[in-house]
Amino acid sequence: MADEQDAAGEQPVFQIQRVYLKDLSLEQPNSPQILIEQGQPAVDVNLGIEVQPIADGVFEVAVSATVTTKLGERTLFLCEAKQAGIFEIRNIDADQMQPILGIACPGIVYPYLRAVVADIISRAGFPPVHLAEVNFQAMYEAQQQSGAQQLNS
């Protein structure tokens, strides 16, 4: 019986504790004048991932997006959002921990971020910007290669 408890204690644990909106802002610095101008706006999207340990075996993983939309040289709107999740991750091999934090966790949080960004932009009176699907595995692998290249330089 004690052996069963020890074996159960060694089982890998991956649990989502909470997903929440950590930060959100939308600015229209040139309103209302820019709203009557005609033209095709240019949309620029930047994504980021942050990982913070918050307790033993508990991590906060945040995915952020900055959406900048310009009409010519003037900003139509700027949306910044950060969606985060708290994950309990225990009894995982060290070589598997970074991919879980860099691929699996952002993949869970990102759909919430996409919905928030589209919603806030449409509530501001603009057509929603639907963030593209992201291959977090490819992003993680590119980041790993970039880091390895910097170490070799």
Curated annotation (Swiss-Prot):
Gene3D superfamilies: SecB-like. One of its GO terms (biological process) is protein tetramerization. GO terms for molecular function: unfolded protein binding. Keywords: Chaperone, Cytoplasm, Protein transport, Translocation, Transport. It is found in: Cytoplasm. The keyword Iron-sulfur does not apply. GO terms for cellular component: cytoplasm. Its main location: cytoplasm. The keyword Protein transport applies. Belongs to the SecB family. One of the proteins required for the normal export of preproteins out of the cell cytoplasm. It is a molecular chaperone that binds to a subset of precursor proteins, maintaining them in a translocation-competent state. It also specifically binds to its receptor SecA. Homotetramer, a dimer of dimers. One homotetramer interacts with 1 SecA dimer. HAMAP family: SecB. This is Protein-export protein SecB. It comes from Leptothrix cholodnii (strain ATCC 51168 / LMG 8142 / SP-6).
